[in-house]
Amino acid sequence: MRVALKLAYIGTEFHGSQIQPNVETVEGELFKALRNLGIIESPKSANYTCAGRTDAGVHALEQVVAFDTDKLNLAIPRVINSELTPGIWVWAHAEVPLSFDARRDAVSRHYRYVMSGKEYDISKIREASKFLLGTHDFENFSRTNGEKSTVRTIERIDARIDGELIKIDVVGNSFLWNMVRKIVTALSMIGKGVRDTDWLLQMLNPEIYEEGIESAPAYGLTLLKVNYNEKIEWIEDNYSIRRAGDQNQKRILRHRVMAEVLEELISHE
């Protein structure tokens, strides 16, 4: 049988999602848990697939992975979570066809970037985002990673103000390495008035215009959702969701305390 999982993770606690030697990664921790439980022997023998790689510091709410196993009774969120570090949690599972590939079968991916909104003109960001919709060559918005083509399609970009923050949602069929974070950088520059839409149009024509721009910080980016055409009967584990929520409330409290401490360090009072 083949099982798919939805997992979430705090990206700042890992050196990316893809397994690497000598550093802690999301896949490294997941594979260790699955092996310890006897769910798989190895990723290769289980035909493991993942919806997409996230870089160090990037978070996920709904990363999707799939693998073959004959231990369906163990391949469920609360059992797997018992072997996972608190920075990762599985919260839904489903039986899927043996042919299901979490990456190739995905039709779109939804990312959200959160940043401070005090310095930006949201109307300029929204206007500029319209030029990015559709199919373009995003070579100027990526780090070279051996991709055969840098042409990608963006289906939707939404920018909105939420209190003192700006949230930018980007939905597309697939993304190049660092593409979303570089798009955020470009929109931020336009929102600050440092660049304009004429420059953005030039950036979308890499055959005649080349410019490297920095990626926005990884900690603001989350993979929110991966979409598939085929209907998958996901079973959510409310206990695992509730437990993760409790742990994240503790993280929120810690960050609030740290924010106050930093304010005191600035004020010298």
Swiss-Prot record:
The EC number(s) this enzyme carries: 5.4.99.12
Entry's Gene Ontology molecular function annotations: RNA binding; tRNA pseudouridine(38-40) synthase activity
UniProt KW Ligase keyword: no
Catalytic activity of the protein: uridine(38/39/40) in tRNA = pseudouridine(38/39/40) in tRNA
InterPro entries: PsdUridine_synth_cat_dom_sf, PsdUridine_synth_TruA, PsdUridine_synth_TruA_a/b_dom, PsdUridine_synth_TruA_C, TruA/RsuA/RluB/E/F_N
A biological process term (GO) from this entry: tRNA pseudouridine synthesis
CDD domains given in the database record: PseudoU_synth_TruA_Archea (cd02866)
Domain of life: Archaea
Alphabetical UniProt keywords: Isomerase, tRNA processing
Catalytic residues of the enzyme: D55 (nucleophile)
Residue numbers binding substrate: Y111
Record NCBIfam families: hisT_truA
PANTHER family, alphabetized: PSEUDOURIDYLATE SYNTHASE, TRNA PSEUDOURIDINE SYNTHASE-LIKE 1
Functional summary from the UniProt entry: Formation of pseudouridine at positions 38, 39 and 40 in the anticodon stem and loop of transfer RNAs.
Protein family according to the UniProt entry: Belongs to the tRNA pseudouridine synthase TruA family.
Name of protein: tRNA pseudouridine synthase A
